[in-house]
């Protein structure tokens, strides 16, 4: 089972370090619930993440969805390259960059 730390740096800033993977994503989500609730703006530094996979991407998207449903802002810094690559391949990278809600990122085609 992988290890991780989620450090509260104060004023809505957090640092996630260690594994962000199938082994840890659910636990990270559980650990983050209470400290995230206290803030309307969140900045999560991911530069300490040492291992990531598609479950890590799913975790970040879950946080974006939660933030939008609870009227909060969420931003990521230090995004792991592997997560960015998976996000680009699956065309959800804009969600991470702009914090859009799932339902709003697909635009309707132009009617002519």
Briefly describe each language-model feature range.
Residues 1-52, 61-112:
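STAS-like cytosolic regulatory interaction modules
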């Amino acid at each position: 089972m992988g290890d991780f730390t989620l450090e509260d740096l104060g004023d809505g800033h957090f640092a996630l370090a260690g594994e962000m993977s199938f082994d840890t994503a659910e636990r990270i989500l559980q650990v983050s619930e209470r400290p995230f609730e206290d803030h309307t703006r969140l900045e999560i530094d991911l530069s300490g993440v040492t291992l990531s996979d598609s479950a890590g991407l799913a975790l970040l998207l879950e946080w974006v969805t939660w933030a939008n449903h609870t009227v909060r802002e969420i931003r990521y810094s230090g995004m792991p390259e592997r997560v960015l690559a998976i996000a680009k391949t699956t065309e959800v990278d804009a969600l991470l960059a702009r914090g859009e809600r799932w339902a709003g990122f697909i635009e309707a085609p132009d009617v002519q």
